[in-house]
From Swiss-Prot:
Keywords in alphabetical order: Autophagy, Endosome, Membrane, Protein transport, Transport, Vacuole
Signal peptide span: none
Composition bias type Low complexity, residue spans: 41-57
Domain of life: Eukaryota
Family the UniProt entry places it in: Belongs to the MON1/SAND family.
A Pfam family this chain is assigned to: Fuz_longin_3
Topology relative to the membrane: Peripheral membrane protein
Entry GO CC: fungal-type vacuole membrane; Mon1-Ccz1 complex; multivesicular body membrane
Protein's UniProt name: Vacuolar fusion protein MON1
Gene Ontology biological process terms, A to Z: autophagy; protein targeting to vacuole; vesicle-mediated transport
Function noted in UniProt: In complex with YALI0F03861p/CCZ1, is required for multiple vacuole delivery pathways including the cytoplasm to vacuole transport (Cvt), autophagy, pexophagy and endocytosis. The MON1-CCZ1 complex acts at the fusion of vesicles with the vacuole, through its regulation of the SNARE complex during the coordinated priming and docking stages of fusion, and particularly at the stage of tethering/docking.
Organism of origin: Yarrowia lipolytica (strain CLIB 122 / E 150) (Yeast)
UniProt subcellular location: Endosome, Multivesicular body membrane; Prevacuolar compartment membrane; Vacuole membrane
Amino acid sequence: MEDGAKDDYIKDIYRHASPNADTDSFLGSPTVAIDSTLSTSNSLSNLNLDTNDSSSSPPAHNDDVPDIAEVLQEMLATTELPSSTTDLDYEPELDLVGGHRRNLGQLNDYGSPRADSFVSLDPPSIGTEVEQFLSKKKQFFILSSAGKPIYTLHGSDDVILGYLGVLQTVVSAYQADESGDNLMSFRAGKTLVVVAVEGPLILAAVSKIGESESQLRAQLDVLYTQILSTLTKNQIHRIYANQSNFDLRNLLQGTDVYLDALTREIVNGSPSILLGALEPLILRKSIREEIDGVLLSCRTPSLLYGLIVSDSKLANVIRPKKHSLHPPDLILLFSMLFNTTSFRDGEHWVPICLPKFNSTGFLYAYIHFFSKSSALIQISADKNAFFELREAKQQILSQMEDKGLIKALERAEERGRFKPVDVAVPMVRHFLYKSRAHVQYVMPSYETHYYEPHMQRGLLTFYHQLHAQVNSDSSRGSNNGWRFMHLVRNSCIGFAWITPSFELYCVSGPNVSRATLAASIHSIAKWVSQHRERLFVIGGAVF
């Protein structure tokens, strides 16, 4: 995207935050422009899709690729159909224990994504199903290497099958090429398509909202992690080794609700997924330490990890010394718990694969919501630990109730995030601060500048743009890990500052001087450092 186009794009973000915004101008048309750039794993080559341009040079790949690219261009531009230290369970039993063990799919006989968890990028649906499909600003596709559909964000099988067939053909053409290149991404106008090949699965993201390749690739990794939470990597490879055209939806039946919830979170602009970090619950240090003490005193021999989470925010963790769960696994787990209705009743005992912890085996999670939006999660490698962990839950909640800790959690949840005025930086409207050491982030509430959902969505889209810019080659920085980006627009000013210890992204109003903004940035970093033990979960309860 040229510099002028980038300027117009950012302006459009803030036009989108206005009730009179033109949503089509915000993100461009659904058709694909002629100029296209194609990226492979080992090289970057330019591919001109205009067959009338005799000056274009052929790509350095096999002869089939230009024709395939022309087919893809034509179809997209028309409305015609076209390692762990613990031994894990590799084939979890799905029988009931105490009436509570279910697999993730069985939970969704009655589960669904939360209705309040989605802010659409798109205008109201009009026209035919194909026209609606092509008008979407963002798409995700998951298919097998044989072209069988597994998941799509938008569109029925009747609409998507032709597109998936072309996508599978393009990917296969590059895999068959003797150069050893794999198709990584290609761009057509404002549309960026990013492809990830994970064994027998192909994942693709299509975005018209100015996201970078690395951002889309991180989103695809989250979706792949979601699939691995139900079927391990070994299971998937074994299935397709025996039957290459197998329909994986037969085994994932019932878990599409989690993919729906996760893609909604991505489309909403989730800071957790953007930053690859968890949001902690803001809690007094003394309260957090007291809860840690309860978790340690009630720990059972089979417990591997324990978590207390309030409205997707991490409050406490109990873990083995020198071992931590990975944020991508917890982002996945929190999305399943808090963005669907599957786990809200009673207690649950489910096998789950946490791929960043171990992608080849299952752990078992005991999940219990002890208030409307707070849950106790106990994770074990022992499939027979249900009753042991249930008893531990009763002891934990009894002690927390006696010490007033459940009420303390409820008060912290009611207070929510701190307000921008609490930080005493009046020129800053909003910011994201990520502690790289703790892999956690904090941000103020959206008031008073971003009180409407579409305003919040515009802000988060701008953060994605700022994140992409500061992590690009065009950002200013030094070789010691410091980078910064200063973006001046008509409606706002954005600033990103990356250091070895933190990442900070902030947005101010227009006409704020660079000196004032720099002083505000330093004030934010100082304030976070002063309150770090209240803002972040540091270490947790270690055994």
